[in-house]
Amino acid sequence: MNYPGRGSPRSPEHNGRGGGGGAWELGSDARPAFGGGVCCFEHLPGGDPDDGDVPLALLRGEPGLHLAPGTDDHNHHLALDPCLSDENYDFSSAESGSSLRYYSEGESGGGGSSLSLHPPQQPPLVPTNSGGGGATGGSPGERKRTRLGGPAARHRYEVVTELGPEEVRWFYKEDKKTWKPFIGYDSLRIELAFRTLLQTTGARPQGGDRDGDHVCSPTGPASSSGEDDDEDRACGFCQSTTGHEPEMVELVNIEPVCVRGGLYEVDVTQGECYPVYWNQADKIPVMRGQWFIDGTWQPLEEEESNLIEQEHLNCFRGQQMQENFDIEVSKSIDGKDAVHSFKLSRNHVDWHSVDEVYLYSDATTSKIARTVTQKLGFSKASSSGTRLHRGYVEEATLEDKPSQTTHIVFVVHGIGQKMDQGRIIKNTAMMREAARKIEERHFSNHATHVEFLPVEWRSKLTLDGDTVDSITPDKVRGLRDMLNSSAMDIMYYTSPLYRDELVKGLQQELNRLYSLFCSRNPDFEEKGGKVSIVSHSLGCVITYDIMTGWNPVRLYEQLLQKEEELPDERWMSYEERHLLDELYITKRRLKEIEERLHGLKASSMTQTPALKFKVENFFCMGSPLAVFLALRGIRPGNTGSQDHILPREICNRLLNIFHPTDPVAYRLEPLILKHYSNISPVQIHWYNTSNPLPYEHMKPSFLNPAKEPTSVSENEGISTIPSPVTSPVLSRRHYGESITNIGKASILGAASIGKGLGGMLFSRFGRSSTTQSSETSKDSMEDEKKPVASPSATTVGTQTLPHSSSGFLDSAYFRLQESFFNLPQLLFPENVMQNKDNALVELDHRIDFELREGLVESRYWSAVTSHTAYWSSLDVALFLLTFMYKHEHDDDAKPNLDPI
């Protein structure tokens, strides 16, 4: 059953050449499906390294599949399975002796010669974008290759034959109007699967026009060559009407083809492309391109392309071709009459020669314009015709493939995902596209690339159902719904009822994606593949809690156990005291039994880590993590290591990225060493900066107090700038210091209110409020100058209490203050140890990195847009890739050049 126009293999008698040609074979009994040509994989022992052969795939054997005769002397003959994943293919070099060959009908039985995919007479095409990923197509003009071998180099043969698989190009629809080409590696594999589908079923079940239903003429196109073959009239999408039964249906299973770096799969039976690692409602149409529009190299609709290809073969098969795509064809066809014309539904095609084909619209307006311009002396083609090209401008080769993925990045979203379903997928696509541009520009010498995978955890959560929506008033409903879909996620996470659901949702999705990626890339872990996480907004906090295992319920129970107050026994009776003693003894006994039980459980089963992988880099973008840590009692330490907030055995490197006007972002460095509140964050380089200074070589700079508004008066201004190893003298800083102040204000809210009320209501019984306020301000200044003392040494004397006769308010404030200063010691005793030489300690690595503001950027407008501006930023993409590729250049013997 012949399917002309479907790229069926060509025979050497059409080539004008004898031996040494190339094509494919699948088995001798499959030849009827391809009009005499079938495909197989041949392993040639001791192959000639100079024969120019390029292997396409290692083909899996199927029982009962007969191979081409005359090939019994070879080692392996394997049946075709074009849909194996990348790791199951064996793309061995020509030196290994493996090659993909095609045997035409009649020559395989007689021991005739075969033609390789790249014959020795034609040098292989050299791609201009050979360095780097190549997972995305790019415009034809940017991806056009240098062709060698003269005018005959465009086509493998000098006569008209069926298009070869390397001349056909598959496309996917990037938007509603634009088709984007698959890279050569992907296109060859899709074409191989498509031809396998043709030879098993006779046609594609779900094909045709991607934007509508396909309608095929029952009679097919008129044949100008006089041939009246029903099979030749088939458009390629309709089932054959010859009555032949499909062959080998049981032997070949058409599996999806992995494309675009393994992120997507193509189902040739449905003509669709869909993502592997995330859900997408709209499937992506794919199309097989044979005829292309001049200039843009966009493919004609598949229905019209199939009809034109069939008509072209019927009229010009075996005739000489002269077209050469290396030279611009500017030869005028004025005065030339069309040698052949073919009518389509809305257009018609004129052939002025074998390789001069023009498409004309048959719309009324086009006909009128064509008539007028022709009367003015213009040719028909130059006035309204569109030149068509047969075969894609760039031949597909196996070398045009994406580089190996050695580093994956999970991109975690924050709040607002419920409001815009699938937003994280679009944001990750923007970040991936920005990273591809940066890789081509700055990391083109790398043979590997970084892959970004979106982590969508919000849509699978149930939470309260629609309870919050049911209690929402109808007035300004749009604003309320927006708040319910965005800011409500913060309240859910702070709720002890729903927090675990959010944590488990993200944890399970991270582990699912990692397991799926490793199953599709088995050598990822063996070759030392690394994993990083990029989190945004609230996603930073949830990711941090998953990695560290922070549980507020468990910590609260520990706090209650350590802070349990003994009742006053002075007014108890003897019987009450006796019962209380028995209660304590019983509790102690119960605690011992619980500890023994936990010990037995711990010895019998080991606790599995929350994540199945170690995080190499944890990037926080627009992160409020510092505020959450401050509210949990984290205070500056004395080690200068990120272990103070995130141990290195959990995550190798923590990096905090923020825009200076992002209202949600806060600094992390002042939570490790307090005096870093006076040191500015590291400025992130612009992506187009030439020869930027490496981040580890950048010296620290101080925040300019003159440019930052403060609440201190002129008399309290500081005239000198402290050294980087001294504690800050300013009473309050714009950066960093607000973290501690906000944390203290949130935890001691009740104490502050009580203190304020005590000062206002009872100041008449003590000192004046003016004196009190002045002394309080002075004491506050002194506290800022002092290093942070350990909670055990902190007493009520360190701060001025309201001096009044209100014993109740003073006592309440004292107790709340004492609880606050003891909280870090109770929860994190290892993080509050201080050193007298605290001023000499510096950070091992910088953590806070700040994007540069635009020269004409409005800060007020930027405050609205900056929180969501990270995804498409090329500066952020360059920063991420700089640290992800850094491990390839690290030298263990190299001294640490980080200044702080």
Swiss-Prot record:
Pfam family, one: DDHD
One CC-aspect GO term: cytoplasm
Matching PROSITE patterns: DDHD
Cell compartments where the protein resides: Cytoplasm
Enzyme class: hydrolase
Segments forming domain DDHD: 611-886
Assembly information from the UniProt record: Forms homooligomers and, to a much smaller extent, heterooligomers with DDHD2.
Name of this protein: Phospholipase DDHD1
Species annotation: Homo sapiens (Human)
Gene: DDHD1
